[in-house]
Amino acid sequence: MIDTHTHLYSEEFDNDRAAVIARAKAAGVTHCFIPAIDSIYTDRMFALKNDYPDYVFLMNGLHPCNVKENYKEELAHVENLMPTHHFCAIGEIGIDLYWDKTFLKEQQEAFAWQIQLAKKHKLPIVIHCREAFEEVFEVLESEKGDDLFGIFHCFTGTEEQAHRAIGYGLHLGIGGVVTFKNGKLDQFLKNIDLQHLVLETDSPYLAPVPYRRKRNESAYIVQVMQKLSDIYALPESEIERITNVNATKIFQL
């Protein structure tokens, strides 16, 4: 299995990171893809890569929740990092209006700029969207093309929004929310071809049932796979195979 989205550098793993990674490997997780947040976490990400060079793969980008007054400095940091490392994607990037709409204009500008950066380097994007589907789609519409591809991380939208995202060349990142009773994804996901899905945890956040409200970790991706096996009425091995192929293509492994 491939965990396409995990914050393994998070402080929440500082006391037992090696054990968390050992459990992930024991569960069958072969690759962990690591989204960027902002410049504060850069050193932690590179330290993680140094410790697990063949297991973790780093993205570069500015998280929409961290688009503040200094966002242009942060974007310059992102650009300056590009020659220093082989990044697997630009992410996580997007728009988040859940807590605050103060910086919507700046979030839109940062999102579009980072999409263009990804295109320049022929990299996928990994999108963060919260309470902002229309705003995200507006930017994607302006940037659409054959060179736009990637993952709509932690997809929690409707079936119609799923098809719109796929229409822009994106795969849907499916994580713990699919196991929630109120998650609603299970009501329509079987209408979406598996070739458009990848697995993720977003750990340490959004742990799947039966670990909900506890710290999430990559090993719990098994519960996501099991839920998809139920939804699609396919063996877990087939869910794993197809989503692995999808992730491998996106990240050009």
For the regions a protein language model found, what residue spans apply to each?
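Mid-domain alpha/beta scaffold segments of enzyme catalytic cores
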Residues: 1-253
